[in-house]
Amino acid sequence: MAKLSLRNVQKTYAGGTQVVHGIDMEIADGEFIVIVGPSGCGKSTLLRMVAGLETITGGEIHIGDKVVNDLEPAARDIAMVFQNYALYPHMSVYDNMAYGLKIRGMSKGEIEQRVKHAAGILELASLLDRKPRALSGGQRQRVAMGRAIVREPSVFLFDEPLSNLDAKLRVQMRLELKDLHRRLKTTSLYVTHDQVEAMTLADRMMVLNGGRVEQIGTPLEVYARPASTFVAGFIGSPPMNLVPVARNGSGQGVAQMRVQPKDGQAAATLGHLPMGLHLPEQALMGLRPEHIEPCAVHEAIAELDVRVVEALGADSFAYGSLGGQPIVVRLDSQTQVRAGDKLPITASAEHLHFFDVQSGKRIEAQA
C-alpha cells in the first residue's frame, strides 16, 4: 500500500486542447477516493495518467515517495479494473487470475496461494475451473477484480467497473466493493459518472467538471455544503433546486427575498426566512427537495403552485413553481397533494444555500 499524490497534474493534447487543468490532491495510504463527473470531464483521462496509459504534460504524480511520470505501467505497482472485463475466453477463472503472475515469473506455489486467497475473498472458490462464458456478469466482474487483487499492488485503479452490470447487480457489487476495501485497505482511485456509487463508496470524492476540480471532500461534506452550482446540481437525486432571488429587505431578525420571475410570471416573495442574516443583493438560492417541508400557511416562506405529483410508495415528489421558477419537493407518504394545489412550504436556515449569480461559486450568508 502507498499514498498517492497528484501535484498540478495537467493534460494537453496536440493542437492545444487542454482536458485536465492543474489537479492537486493528496490521497492517504489506504484511502478510497472516487472521481465523479459527467461524460467528458476528464476523469478517465486522469485515471489513465496515474496508470501510465496516458502521458502527463504537466505536474507530477507520486506513488509512495516515487515520481512515476516517466515509468511504464508495469513499473508503477498498480492494478487496474476496467469497465470491460477483458477476460481470456479460452482460460479458466483460475488461469485468468493467475496469468499476470505467471508472466512475472512467480513460483507455482505462490501463484496458487494468491489465487486461492483472492478467490476466497470474492466467493469464487467453487468457480475456478469454469470458463468466462459460464459465468454471470457479476461473477465475471469479480474475476476481473480477483486478477487485480492477486498482484497485491500499492494502488487499485477502477475505471467505471460496474457500468456494464444491470441495476440489481450494481447494488450488489457496490456492497462487495465496499466490503473488499474494508478488508484489504489498499489505496484506491475509482472513476464513475454515477453519484450513488460515489456517495456510497468514497472516503472522499473529487467532483470534476471540464477537467477542473469543483470540490474535494467527504460525501457528506459535498452533499451538505456544495462548493458551486455545478456540484449542487450534480450531487443529489433529484438535484438541488436553484432559484434566482433578490434581496427584499429585512426586519426584526427575519430576512426576506423575492424570487426573480420567469416567463412573465409574477414575482414570488419569500417571507419568514428563519434567519437574521446579511444576504447578498442577488444570488441563486439552493434548497434540496428533501429539505423543503409542508407547513401551515402562516409559517410558510412561500406557496408552491403544484403542477405534477409523482407517487413512489414510501415518498412522493411534487413538481411545481415559484414565480415561474421550477421547484421539486420530496414529501412523505402521509402528505396528500394534488396537481393544482397551492402547497405552503418552509425550510430551516441550515438547509438554505446561496451561490454567486455570475461565477456559480458558493457564498456564505453572514450573520
Curated annotation (Swiss-Prot):
Localisation per UniProt entry: Cell inner membrane
Cellular component terms per the entry's GO annotation: ATP-binding cassette (ABC) transporter complex, substrate-binding subunit-containing
Reactions the enzyme catalyzes: sn-glycerol 3-phosphate(out) + ATP + H2O = sn-glycerol 3-phosphate(in) + ADP + phosphate + H(+)
CDD domains: ABC_MalK_N
Sorted UniProt keywords: ATP-binding, Cell inner membrane, Cell membrane, Membrane, Nucleotide-binding, Sugar transport, Translocase, Transport
ABC transporter domain: residues covered: 4-235
PROSITE patterns for this protein: ABC_TRANSPORTER_1, ABC_TRANSPORTER_2, UGPC
Major site of localization recorded for this protein: membrane
Residues holding ATP: 37-44
Membrane topology classification: Peripheral membrane protein
Disulfide bonds: none
KW ATP-binding (keyword) present: yes
Coiled coil (UniProt feature): none
GO molecular function per UniProt: ABC-type glycerol-3-phosphate transporter activity; ATP binding; ATP hydrolysis activity
Domain of life: Bacteria
EC class (word): translocase
Keyword presence, Transcription regulation: no
InterPro entries: AAA+_ATPase, ABC_transporter-like_ATP-bd, ABC_transporter-like_CS, ABC_transpr_MalK-like, ABC_transpr_MalK/UgpC-like, Mo/tungstate-bd_C_term_dom, NA-bd_OB-fold, P-loop_NTPase
Enzyme Commission code(s) on record: 7.6.2.10
Subunit record text: The complex is composed of two ATP-binding proteins (UgpC), two transmembrane proteins (UgpA and UgpE) and a solute-binding protein (UgpB).
Stated role: Part of the ABC transporter complex UgpBAEC involved in sn-glycerol-3-phosphate (G3P) import. Responsible for energy coupling to the transport system.
Family as reported in the entry's similarity comment: Belongs to the ABC transporter superfamily. sn-glycerol-3-phosphate importer (TC 3.A.1.1.3) family.
Protein name: sn-glycerol-3-phosphate import ATP-binding protein UgpC
Annotated gene: ugpC
